[in-house]
Curated annotation (Swiss-Prot):
Signal peptide: 1-30
Residues with Pyrrolidone carboxylic acid modification: Q31
Pfam families assigned: Glyco_hydro_68
Activity regulation behaviour: Strongly inhibited by Hg(2+) and slightly activated by Co(2+). Not inhibited by the metal ion chelator EDTA, suggesting that this enzyme does not need a metal cofactor.
Listed name of the protein: Levansucrase
Example GO BP: carbohydrate utilization
Organism: Gluconacetobacter diazotrophicus (Acetobacter diazotrophicus)
């Protein structure tokens, strides 16, 4: 036995030196291939402007006759710890309808073409027939680069069991965070049509996330969206920030007591061998933040409050300082009519402006979304404190879900997602992704594209009643709810999940699309993929985490690797096997 251990140790040392070169080359190759692919996509093609010009009509803030002008936003940066909050105003949001085509036939798309996600076919494939998938995110570092781990790409998703007896629209109270993996560096054209992801199962051990609510009464406990952060490059520690939620409901799904939502952290480790990816840990779950009722609305103020979706990052303008953005609502009792002229944002003497009383009379004050900010107060990211919201949407919208920070050409972009059905009375917009641009993490953020905020929406007829994803209107565009939960990735790639296409429910990953960004405007890149649609679930890493020590340990620690049995064979044969795997 001692002789075998010495053989394994010697083999480990030999592999370590060789793997350093092989894996390092793989990392450079992966990043180089990504850069070349993006350059090819951006190359000039006849009839398409390579940059600027008519490709980005959303740069215009000139306004539309019959509609108010958008609010004036400077994009000026402020101290992140100041109490300045930018506003997504009604004047801003009304630009969506202003730039919608009122003359289209019923059920057609009325949105600007460059801001419309291409049509998803109704015969879409599913990622896995035994699991519903919706909100999805990637393994990122503090700069939001997306990492593969020792040759594997990994994604994290909200999942539910389609065979458990509840319907697709009841999945939220049963949500568990699951993970999928696939080999890195393979173009979408060479993968299975559904993206080629293998389901790895639930990320957390059964019952682990419920410890946050130990001793409390609830009928359902679920895991909602967040982010997964690789804590050290060339390491395997992963910190998951997610929303731990608990519901206490009667048989008719009415709240007995308000739901609870706690932003929570848990630590684990990622592992990989020749055949699969797995995780260990995630047994201890640390509550980080609960809405305080001062900056962020809580359940005592509104049983329908929103507080979820943590996304963490280090601000390059403040090295070593970690921030978190999340979805919230403006604090205060639900139903109090206290929106202000500043929330409306109309310019002085604008002839098309609404009056404050008109807005309050419409009941728009029930919609008070915001995008929150917190700052870490320790190096382990296990202690945080609230800061003032980054953006408020009082009397505009009630949900600004899954916010993220995206840096591009020196600008700070906040992207978030929202529904048509959560807009306040008198304003309208499609299901899709909304964006805001400024000069720092706290800025007087300017809504993108005509000053509206809309970055990319589903094909929608804003002249026709919305309907719902579970009960679509026959007069509405059949793809108005085709996708949701968009996440903007490096290179402008955008992933999402399929909700409803021509009355077919999804619960699977949508085709990836690409948006091009130019200052305060964006445009869907129709040159990407096939008419603007890339591969289903094509979520590529743009960086590679090469953890040599972990790679070797995982190879010899798993019987599926096949290496343990070869410990006494020729080192060169084993090394050749490793090289072949990493260079496939």
């Amino acid at each position: 036995m001692a002789h075998v251990r010495r053989k394994v140790a010697t083999l480990n040392m030999a592999l370590a030196g060789s793997l350093l070169m092989v894996l390092g080359a793989q990392s450079a190759l992966a990043q180089g291939n990504f850069s070349r692919q993006e350059a090819a996509r951006m190359a000039h093609r006849p009839g398409v402007m390579p940059r600027g010009g008519p490709l980005f009509p959303g740069r215009s803030l000139a306004g539309v006759p019959g509609f108010p002008l958008p609010s004036i936003h400077t994009q000026q940066a402020y101290d992140p710890q100041s109490d300045f909050t930018a506003r997504w105003t009604r004047a801003d949001a009304l630009q969506i309808k202003a730039h919608s085509d009122a003359t289209v036939a019923a059920g057609q798309n009325s949105l600007p073409a460059q801001l419309t996600m291409p049509n998803i076919p109704a015969d879409f494939p599913v990622i896995n027939p035994d699991v519903w998938v919706w909100d999805t995110w990637t393994l990122i570092d503090k700069h939001a680069d997306q990492f593969s781990y020792n040759g594997w790409e990994v994604i994290f998703c909200l999942t539910a069991d389609p065979n458990a007896g509840y319907g697709f629209d009841d999945r939220h109270v049963h949500a568990r965070i699951g993970f999928f993996y696939r080999r890195a560096g393979i173009p979408a054209s060479r993968r299975p049509v559904n993206g080629g992801w293998t389901y790895g199962g639930h990320l957390f051990p059964d019952g682990a996330s419920a410890q946050v609510y130990a001793g409390q009464t609830y009928t359902n406990q679920a895991e909602w969206s967040g982010s997964s952060r690789l804590m050290q490059i060339h390491g395997n520690t992963v910190s998951v920030f997610y929303t731990d939620v608990a519901f206490n409901r009667d048989a008719n799904a009415n709240n007995i007591t308000p739901p609870q939502a706690i932003i929570t952290q848990t630590l684990g480790r990622i592992h990989a061998d020749f055949n699969h990816v797995w995780f260990t840990g995630f047994t201890a779950h640390t509550p980080l933040l609960q809405p305080d009722g001062v900056l962020y609305q809580n359940g005592a103020q509104n049983e329908f409050f929103n507080f979820r979706d943590p996304f963490t990052f280090e601000d390059p303008k403040h090295p070593g300082v970690n921030y978190m953005v999340f979805e919230g609502n403006t604090a205060g009792q639900r139903g109090v009519a206290n929106c202000t002229e500043a929330d409306l944002g109309f310019r002085p003497n604008d002839p098309n402006a609404e009056t404050l009383q008109e807005v309050l009379d419409s009941g728009a004050y029930y919609q008070k979304a915001n995008i929150g900010l917190a700052i870490a107060t320790d190096s382990t990211l296990s202690k945080w404190k609230f800061l003032s919201p980054l953006i408020s949407a009082n009397c505009v919208n009630d949900q600004t879900e899954r916010p993220q920070v995206y840096l591009h050409n020196g600008k700070y972009y906040i992207f978030t997602i929202s529904h048509r059905t959560t807009f306040a009375a008198g304003v309208d917009g499609p299901d899709g992704v909304y964006g805001f641009v400024g000069d720092g993490i706290r800025s007087d953020f300017q809504p993108m594209n005509y000053g509206s905020g809309l970055t990319m929406g589903n094909p929608t007829d804003l002249n026709t009643a919305a309907g719902t994803d579970f009960d679509p209107s026959p007069d509405q565009n059949p793809r108005a709810f085709q996708s949701y939960s968009h996440y903007v990735m490096p290179g402008g790639l955008v992933e999402s999940f399929i909700d409803t296409v021509e009355n077919r429910r999804g619960g699977t990953l949508a085709p990836t699309v690409r948006v091009r960004i130019a200052q305060n405007a964006s445009a869907v890149d129709l040159r990407y993929g096939n008419g603007g649609l890339g591969g289903y679930g094509d979520i590529p890493a743009n960086r590679a985490d090469v953890n040599i020590a972990g790679f070797i340990q995982d190879l010899f620690g798993q019987p599926t690797s096949g290496l343990a049995a070869q410990a006494s064979t020729n080192n060169a044969q084993v090394l050749a096997q490793v090289r072949q795997f990493l260079n496939q």
